[in-house]
């Protein structure tokens, strides 16, 4: 039996508190409950993946994700990680509805295999970059003091792109944006407005117009409309002076093809938890062939769980927008041995 065959695996559920409540148009949480998955090859090499469901995937409870990962681990025993694609495709075929679990399994498998070959995931993806800068997310808080404090803290840490959650009442969204802008204006910040499916075409355009008139530089409008509203997204993409990103509506290469054909976005936001790593490359290929730009986001992964996304970003160099800040939003976490953060800067170790 080859040294790259899967020998064992472990699954564990753990909860981590957030620095501040995470609030979007879809809900609110004060902690994240993730599932860690470790896989060990016969030669002793280990790989790690982490399943973290977002508020958009609230039906995926940790116990359900853990059960799926345990099943995937059992089916992988004795299989050769040096031939990962059949295992990965089987995981997604069986558990496409539990995407974060399938993705965590895939990440652990590819992490173990590349390590066994003396490679990092970033090197396997192409080794394009050593470092890059991420944005920072500011939740849909209604407390102006909390918003101001979070924005000021992030600015002091060096962040210059602020992703602000919107999608509630227009007045509340504008008040939040103005609070952030007032706190960081001297830095000439850029803004990403994340609607989390909570806006309409008209309200999105009014929000963008108000932000422009207030002097804000809006770089991107992320998934403002419901994920099934391709027609509305196409209209908004056509009418908006700001690039529009598809997030929740793209989980697979087929979804990306539909976005391209219906001209439903000018940017596609890839998340490893939605698509895994190999399908992320396929989605990127579709977007790049159609001259769409790419964003790479995350759920609520720890630093270790975010490692595959960091390596995907830096290894490929494909992404115009990086939203890899989940580790920075946690109250406490252990740094990953495979990358490090200095404020917005993420870099390989």
Question: Which sequence ranges carry the predicted segments?
Answer:
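Metal- or metallocofactor-binding catalytic centers and their adjacent structured scaffolds
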Residues: 3-6, 10, 40-116
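Flexible C-terminal active-site loop/helix
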Residues: 4-18, 34, 262, 299-349
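Short, structured patches in soluble enzyme cores that scaffold and shape functional sites
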Residues: 13, 136-140, 165-168, 195
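Short Gly/Pro-enriched turn/cap motifs at secondary-structure boundaries
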Residues: 25-30
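N-terminal small/glycine-rich loop or linker at the start of catalytic domains
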Residues: 115-140
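Short, charged beta->alpha transition segments
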Residues: 119-124, 144-152
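Catalytic domains of carbohydrate-active enzymes, especially glycoside hydrolases
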Residues: 153-165
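Catalytic core of soluble alpha/beta enzymes
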Residues: 164-307, 330-342
């Amino acid at each position: 039996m080859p040294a790259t065959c899967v020998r064992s695996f472990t699954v564990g559920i753990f909860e981590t508190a957030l620095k501040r409540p995470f609030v979007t148009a879809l809900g609110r949480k004060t902690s994240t409950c993730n599932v860690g998955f470790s896989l060990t090859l016969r030669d002793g090499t280990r790989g790690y993946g982490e399943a973290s469901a977002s508020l958009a995937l609230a039906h995926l409870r940790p116990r359900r994700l853990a059960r799926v990962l345990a099943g995937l681990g059992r089916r992988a025993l004795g299989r050769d990680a040096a031939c990962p694609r059949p295992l990965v495709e089987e995981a997604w075929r069986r558990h496409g509805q539990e995407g974060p679990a399938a993705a965590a399994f895939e990440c652990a498998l590819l992490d173990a295999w590349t390590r066994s070959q003396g490679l990092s995931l970033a090197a396997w993806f192409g080794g394009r970059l050593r470092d890059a800068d991420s944005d920072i997310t500011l939740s849909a808080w209604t407390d102006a003091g909390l918003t101001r404090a979070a924005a000021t803290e992030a600015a002091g840490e060096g962040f210059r792109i602020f992703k602000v959650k919107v999608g509630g009442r227009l007045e509340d969204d504008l008040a939040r944006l103005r609070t952030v802008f007032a706190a960081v204006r001297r830095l000439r910040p850029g803004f990403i407005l994340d609607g989390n499916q909570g806006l309409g075409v008209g309200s999105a355009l009014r929000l963008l117009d108000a932000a422009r008139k207030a002097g804000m530089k809006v770089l991107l409008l992320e998934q403002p409309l419901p994920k099934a509203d391709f027609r509305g997204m196409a209209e908004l993409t056509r009418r908006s002076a700001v690039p529009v990103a598809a997030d929740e509506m793209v989980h697979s290469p087929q979804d990306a093809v539909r976005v391209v054909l219906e001209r439903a976005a000018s940017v596609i936001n890839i998340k490893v938890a939605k698509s895994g790593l190999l399908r992320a490359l396929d989605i990127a290929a579709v977007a790049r062939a159609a001259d769409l730009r790419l964003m790479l986001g995350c759920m609520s992964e720890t630093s270790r769980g975010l490692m595959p996304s960091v390596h995907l970003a830096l290894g490929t160099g494909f992404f115009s927008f990086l939203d890899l800040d989940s580790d920075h939003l946690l109250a406490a976490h252990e740094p990953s041995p495979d990358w490090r953060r200095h404020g917005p800067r993420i870099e390989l170790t």
